[in-house]
From Swiss-Prot:
InterPro entries per the UniProt record, alphabetical: GHMP_kinase_C_dom (IPR013750), GHMP_kinase_C_sf (IPR036554), GHMP_kinase_N_dom (IPR006204), IspE (IPR004424), Ribosomal_Su5_D2-typ_SF (IPR020568), Ribsml_uS5_D2-typ_fold_subgr (IPR014721)
Organism: Clostridium beijerinckii (strain ATCC 51743 / NCIMB 8052)
Root EC class: transferase
Function: Catalyzes the phosphorylation of the position 2 hydroxy group of 4-diphosphocytidyl-2C-methyl-D-erythritol.
Stretch forming the signal peptide: none
Catalytic residues (positions): 8, 133
Matching Gene3D superfamilies: 3.30.230.10, GHMP kinase, C-terminal domain (3.30.70.890)
UniProt feature coiled coil, ranges: none
Metabolic or biological pathway: Isoprenoid biosynthesis; isopentenyl diphosphate biosynthesis via DXP pathway; isopentenyl diphosphate from 1-deoxy-D-xylulose 5-phosphate: step 3/6
Pfam families linked to this entry: GHMP_kinases_C (PF08544), GHMP_kinases_N (PF00288)
NCBIfam families: ispE (TIGR00154)
A single GO molecular function term of this UniProt record: 4-(cytidine 5'-diphospho)-2-C-methyl-D-erythritol kinase activity
Protein's name in the database: 4-diphosphocytidyl-2-C-methyl-D-erythritol kinase
Length: 280
């Protein structure tokens, strides 16, 4: 069995508080994009095996796809194992939910393969044990995600918007970024309600001008190259740029495919991980 596991970007990422257990309380607009890993699974006698086309990706319990298989087996008392083949296209430690979407893909595939017939809500509940973005990745699309990622409201689709992604040649630890975040210093929060209203009207220009990610400044302080990427993409014709998630990937919105292609060509001269894609 095979599935495409899609990446996401954040159109808005707000932090509205912190729980006693240390988790930040979030309010985010998430959007699936047409960049994906491919996951194939087959049944084995009992053990879980994971193979990946990228040598630097761990293939043991450090990998969320492996963890997802293990938790699914335990939750539904499945004695058989799975052989997972992961074809990775989404950059790692990039702010694009690459690990989370792989985990969600494994949960969905195993649900079908073993005829468990768990609902999306059940899969989301298992997913939350793996990471805050996993529940969203079960369904994907355009969604408002709140709490620690567990409250998901599907929104009207904001599909077919042209996106160029650039990931600088380093990864970022989400944990470290949240550790350095100081809510008391935030003056302006994302206008999430206005963004949703204008996304419903398909107003890409309002969205481009009002996208906001509270984690951006934290990552920018350590990595000035993110500012350089944003400025260069704007100078080539992007109508709006922002860092996705905890970074370091920057995405740019375009209203013209020729400008997007020019941006892709220019950025590809400097960076390895550059993609031209669209929202889906």
């Amino acid at each position: 069995m095979k599935i495409k596991a899609y990446a996401k970007i954040n159109i808005a990422l707000d932090i509205v508080g912190k729980r006693e257990d240390g988790y930040h309380i979030l309010k985010m607009i998430m959007q699936t994009i047409d960049l994906y890993d491919i996951i194939e699974i087959e049944k084995t006698e009992s053990e879980i095996r994971l193979n990946c086309n990228k040598h630097y990706v761990p293939t043991d319990e450090r990998n969320l796809a492996y963890k997802a298989a293990k938790i699914f087996k335990e939750t539904y008392s499945i004695s058989q194992g799975v052989d997972i083949k992961l074809t990775k296209n989404i950059p790692v430690s990039a702010g694009l939910a690459g690990g989370s979407t792989d985990a969600a893909g494994v949960l969905k595939l195993m649900n079908k393969m073993f005829n468990v017939n768990a609902s999306d809500e059940e899969l989301k509940s298992i997913g939350l044990r793996l990471g805050a973005d996993v529940p969203y990745c079960i369904k994907g699309g355009t969604a408002l995600c709140e709490g620690i990622g567990e409250k998901i409201t599907q929104l009207k689709s904001f599909k077919d918007k042209i996106i160029v992604l650039v990931k600088p040649p380093f990864g970022v630890s989400t944990k470290e970024v949240y550790k350095c975040f100081d809510l008391s210093k935030v003056v302006f929060h994302p206008k999430i309600d206005s963004l949703i209203e204008n996304m419903n009207n398909d107003d890409v220009y309002f969205v481009a001008n009002n996208m906001k990610n509270l984690l951006e400044n934290v990552t920018l302080r350590k990595h000035r190259v993110i500012t350089n990427i944003k400025e260069e993409m704007k100078s080539i014709g992007s109508i709006g740029t922002m860092m996705s998630g905890s970074g370091p990937t920057v995405f740019a919105l375009f209203d013209d495919m020729l400008k997007a292609q020019l941006c892709y060509d220019e950025m590809k001269k400097k960076y390895k991980d550059v993609f031209i894609t669209r929202t889906i």
